[in-house]
Amino acid sequence: MKFVVSSNTLLTRLQAVSKVIGGKPVQPILDNILLVATEGVLYATASDKETTMEARIELESLEEEGKITIPAKILLDILKEFPEQPLTFEINTETNEVKIISEKGEFSVPGESAEDYPIQAALNDSSNDLTSKCGLILEGIVKTIFATANDDLRPVMNCILIEMNEDNFTFVASDAHKLVRYKRFDAKSENGQFSLILPKKPALMLKNILPKE
């Protein structure tokens, strides 16, 4: 596995997805970020088994496809040391050793097999896609997330309900003491009426990474 990628682009994407990783992962390998290089693109995935985030990074070049997992903290600490420049990643798939080659030298990082990384089950055919302006989703989260609860016994109260129809989007949150409903009439669903429940953790992550426009 061998590819070349922009150091700043990779760092920015990995900083975003790494926010998913919890302090005490249920499996040690979930401290790692899964990297999959294929067809000129690098996919970076982080998960805590409940929430999974994937970033897509265009590669400057891809010599050999493959996949590997690398400890998130080690990788991020290394990337923070580089000014913007192309970095070459060379991975020995037999030993899982990762070499990161820069303009001034190289680092060697121990990786782990991607085969051991738990992959989230694919969505079934009855699932709906939601495509919307980032600013709209961000505004809906900002206007309602403060009303969500922190209740382990009633986890649904820790979420935001998003309802979509042909007329508007509605965001609803409640902790059983207060109820907040926020409607946007400048958005609509083109797939009929449906709804989704967005847990607080991914909602907070989206709040922190989505651009306002």
Task: List where the protein language model places each region.
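Structural preference for solvent-exposed beta-strand-turn elements
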Residues: 1-213
